[in-house]
A protein has these predicted regions:
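Conserved glycine-rich Rossmann-like NAD(P)H-binding loop of the short-chain dehydrogenase/reductase
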Residues: 5-19
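Alpha-helical segment proximal to the catalytic Tyr-Lys
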Residues: 101, 145-149, 206
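Short, small/polar-rich loop/turn modules that mediate ligand/substrate recognition or access, typified
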Residues: 148, 153, 208-210, 216
């Protein structure tokens, strides 16, 4: 929004969507919040149709929805696997597919998928989440090859440990152990991730596609 884009953000509840609309309005930005359950294909189609009618075809898509249902593999239920993969991988494909036609017509597009450091490094107790995020990385490279001739780039941003509500509940011992594995010695800020996403959406990244920007303070280098 700070770069002048019209932003349509989604949330799973009406309250969340209203909060997005309020945030954009207070910032003087164009856009709105909308309710979306990303596992519902009909809702995805309805959302893209609404955006096209009200704002024009999307030129930038940021896939940032994600959930976890952690457990050791031997205890992981099929429903926990399916729910995470449907949300974190299948929905990314569906949303990407929904905007590709408009981007191809415009001969311009930016698809940016937020993955995770664990999709590259792995993490015990998160086989479903790791598989989904690794799948998004592979899919992104495939789409980059498919769509490059139409001036559509597809890239990933892979955050490490970010200072959010999820990490703030850790006790001091857990926090120290986490920081010990990060060469920069601190958690990332949401703004660090946002900056990488904004860069990939900018003209400065026009010749970058099929790659991943790692935002993890050095905890994974590859």
């Amino acid at each position: 929004a700070s770069l002048g884009a019209t932003v349509v953000g989604t949330a799973t509840s009406a309250e969340g969507a209203a909060a997005i609309s309020d945030f954009l309005g207070e910032a003087g930005a164009k856009g709105e919040g909308r309710v979306l359950e990303v596992r519902d294909a009909a809702q995805i189609d309805a959302l893209i149709s609404h955006i096209e009618k009200r704002h024009g075809a999307p030129s930038v898509l940021v896939n940032n929805a994600g959930i976890t249902r952690d457990n050791l593999a031997m205890r992981l239920k099929d429903d926990d696997w399916d729910c995470v993969v449907d949300t974190d991988l299948k929905a990314v494909f569906r949303l990407s597919r929904a905007v590709i036609r408009g981007m191809m017509k415009a001969r311009y597009g930016r698809i940016i998928n937020v993955t995770s450091v664990v999709g590259h490094a792995g993490n015990a107790g998160q086989a479903n989440y790791c598989a989904a995020k690794a799948g998004v990385s592979g899919m992104s490279r495939a789409l980059a090859r498919e769509l490059g001739s139409r001036n559509i780039t597809v890239n990933c941003v892979a955050p490490g440990f970010i200072d959010t509500d999820m990490t703030r509940v850790l006790d001091e011992k857990q926090r120290e152990a986490m920081l010990a594995g990060i060469p920069l010695g601190r958690l990332g800020a949401p703004a660090d991730v946002a900056a990488a996403v904004a860069f990939l959406a900018s003209a400065g990244a026009a010749y970058i596609t099929g790659t991943t920007i790692h935002v993890n303070g050095g905890m994974f280098m590859g």
